[in-house]
Amino acid sequence: MKILKLKEVMDCTALGRSTIYKYISEDTFPKPIPLGSRSVGWLQSEVEDWILARIAERDDSFA
């Protein structure tokens, strides 16, 4: 199990910080895990699952 910091999540998803937090507020992106008083991270597996779901949505729209 690996925890990703915000920059790594941004690199994996090609999304900006504000977009990631917008999707979190809309319950369409995995919620971060508190790591300390001013630090959060995301489970790599949850971010990867989110990416795979976007791919599945794309593929379903072409079917």
Summary of predicted features, one role per range:
Residues 39, 43-62:
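C-terminal structural segments of small proteins and small subunits
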Residues 1-19, 23, 46, 52-54:
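Polyanion-binding surface elements
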Residues 33-38:
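Short Lys/Arg-enriched helix C-cap and helix-to-coil transition segments
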